[in-house]
Amino acid sequence: MRSLLSRLDRFFVASPDPARVGWLREWTYAHRGLHGEGRVENSPAAFRAAVEEGLGIECDLQRSLDDWPMVFHDWDFARLLGSTDQGERRTRAQWQALHYADGEAPIDLAALLEIVAGRVPLLIEVKSKPRYDVTRTCRRVVDALEGYAGPHAVMSFDPRVSRWFKQHSPMTVRGLVMREDSKGHTQSEISRHLALWAAQPDFLAYHVHALPNRMVTAARTAGLPVLTWTVSSPDLRERARQYADAPIAEGAGLP
């Protein structure tokens, strides 16, 4: 059974051009920016700090009510903004009327691109959930990225995102995020392979606690870079070094 799945992996997922994806292996990525010490995750301050430290940036992105791609992880504002509002039910202007503890407001993707300005690479995780129209989000991401020359990639747990970029923006580097625990959508072996075949990604971003495993080993052998998250300790940093190509890290997991 496993040999059949491996053959199907090779059939559905082509090896990416090393010239397109090689840069992914060369960086440590700050998970949601370089947060801590008063800097909030996914905030302008966290992104500025990551750039200053020469770290790549991983960020989260979801859609506002008026279809702006907003940089924010949680579906609601309670944890970080002290509001019970849902992000998808509020316009960009309503998002930006709220403030983090440091006084800054959430930003959209265009504002993040201005902060980064090509100085470090950017990993953009597109948020999704059941019955969510990811196509609308993907279109706005492409609009925001038009003309941006800095290294960047789009990724998601939802294989529809990578598949959409393959079809509609094939030069955008695209990845599939995966985990195997109870919080993931790919707990079973067959579900992981089905997601891989649907996504047809250029790279994987795999949960560090699931390493090592056969899928990651096969992907690296086939030329797909494998990033791993969230690396939050020296021990996990060593695991990432052994079994993946680059870490998405925070706190004590950063170099």
Where are the model-predicted features located?
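Phosphate-group recognition and catalysis centered on beta-loop-alpha active-site segments
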Residues: 1-255
